[in-house]
């Protein structure tokens, strides 16, 4: 078994959809990025890649490649799962934490868990998504961005 950790951050801006955990969340701002900027799925992807010592999402999905412009990060996470498989690993579980001042994430957590589980081909009980605010401290607390942390466990197939 191997453990991985991932972190991602994206700026909140007007004129973008807010997509977290593969869920489009109604809000006046969205996350800025080359892809759909799904901060949670990016952190999870990095955790999985790191656990298998396969680099990070920037290596596999560079923001200079037009093929990834606006791409659904669920497709990226599915590709990460396939990469793990080709290297003899499969995901066991994921624990993640999202820091975001607004909007409230709780109503969307179950769907996020289901999306992540489907991408990784694991049971939804193997996926944890938690969210908290930053108590109005720092860039997250001022509503300027969102931050996600993820820890995963993978095992040999």
UniProtKB/Swiss-Prot annotation:
<dbReference type="GO" id="GO:0019288">
    <property type="term" value="P:isopentenyl diphosphate biosynthetic process, methylerythritol 4-phosphate pathway"/>
</dbReference>
<dbReference type="Pfam" id="PF02542">
    <property type="entry name" value="YgbB"/>
</dbReference>
<dbReference type="GO" id="GO:0046872">
    <property type="term" value="F:metal ion binding"/>
</dbReference>
<feature type="binding site">
    <location>
        <begin position="34"/>
        <end position="35"/>
    </location>
    <ligand>
        <name>4-CDP-2-C-methyl-D-erythritol 2-phosphate</name>
    </ligand>
</feature>
<feature type="binding site">
    <location>
        <begin position="61"/>
        <end position="65"/>
    </location>
    <ligand>
        <name>4-CDP-2-C-methyl-D-erythritol 2-phosphate</name>
    </ligand>
</feature>
<keyword id="KW-0414">Isoprene biosynthesis</keyword>
<feature type="binding site">
    <location>
        <position position="8"/>
    </location>
    <ligand>
        <name>a divalent metal cation</name>
    </ligand>
</feature>
<feature type="binding site">
    <location>
        <position position="10"/>
    </location>
    <ligand>
        <name>a divalent metal cation</name>
    </ligand>
</feature>
<feature type="binding site">
    <location>
        <begin position="8"/>
        <end position="10"/>
    </location>
    <ligand>
        <name>4-CDP-2-C-methyl-D-erythritol 2-phosphate</name>
    </ligand>
</feature>
<feature type="binding site">
    <location>
        <position position="142"/>
    </location>
    <ligand>
        <name>4-CDP-2-C-methyl-D-erythritol 2-phosphate</name>
    </ligand>
</feature>
<keyword id="KW-0479">Metal-binding</keyword>
<feature type="binding site">
    <location>
        <position position="42"/>
    </location>
    <ligand>
        <name>a divalent metal cation</name>
    </ligand>
</feature>
<comment type="similarity">
    <text>Belongs to the IspF family.</text>
</comment>
<comment type="function">
    <text>Involved in the biosynthesis of isopentenyl diphosphate (IPP) and dimethylallyl diphosphate (DMAPP), two major building blocks of isoprenoid compounds. Catalyzes the conversion of 4-diphosphocytidyl-2-C-methyl-D-erythritol 2-phosphate (CDP-ME2P) to 2-C-methyl-D-erythritol 2,4-cyclodiphosphate (ME-CPP) with a corresponding release of cytidine 5-monophosphate (CMP).</text>
</comment>
<feature type="binding site">
    <location>
        <begin position="132"/>
        <end position="135"/>
    </location>
    <ligand>
        <name>4-CDP-2-C-methyl-D-erythritol 2-phosphate</name>
    </ligand>
</feature>
<protein>
    <recommendedName>
        <fullName>2-C-methyl-D-erythritol 2,4-cyclodiphosphate synthase</fullName>
        <ecNumber>4.6.1.12</ecNumber>
    </recommendedName>
</protein>
<feature type="binding site">
    <location>
        <begin position="56"/>
        <end position="58"/>
    </location>
    <ligand>
        <name>4-CDP-2-C-methyl-D-erythritol 2-phosphate</name>
    </ligand>
</feature>
<keyword id="KW-0456">Lyase</keyword>
<feature type="site" description="Transition state stabilizer">
    <location>
        <position position="34"/>
    </location>
</feature>
<dbReference type="InterPro" id="IPR003526">
    <property type="entry name" value="MECDP_synthase"/>
</dbReference>
<dbReference type="GO" id="GO:0008685">
    <property type="term" value="F:2-C-methyl-D-erythritol 2,4-cyclodiphosphate synthase activity"/>
</dbReference>
<comment type="subunit">
    <text>Homotrimer.</text>
</comment>
<dbReference type="InterPro" id="IPR036571">
    <property type="entry name" value="MECDP_synthase_sf"/>
</dbReference>
<dbReference type="GO" id="GO:0016114">
    <property type="term" value="P:terpenoid biosynthetic process"/>
</dbReference>
<feature type="site" description="Transition state stabilizer">
    <location>
        <position position="133"/>
    </location>
</feature>
<dbReference type="InterPro" id="IPR020555">
    <property type="entry name" value="MECDP_synthase_CS"/>
</dbReference>
<comment type="pathway">
    <text>Isoprenoid biosynthesis; isopentenyl diphosphate biosynthesis via DXP pathway; isopentenyl diphosphate from 1-deoxy-D-xylulose 5-phosphate: step 4/6.</text>
</comment>
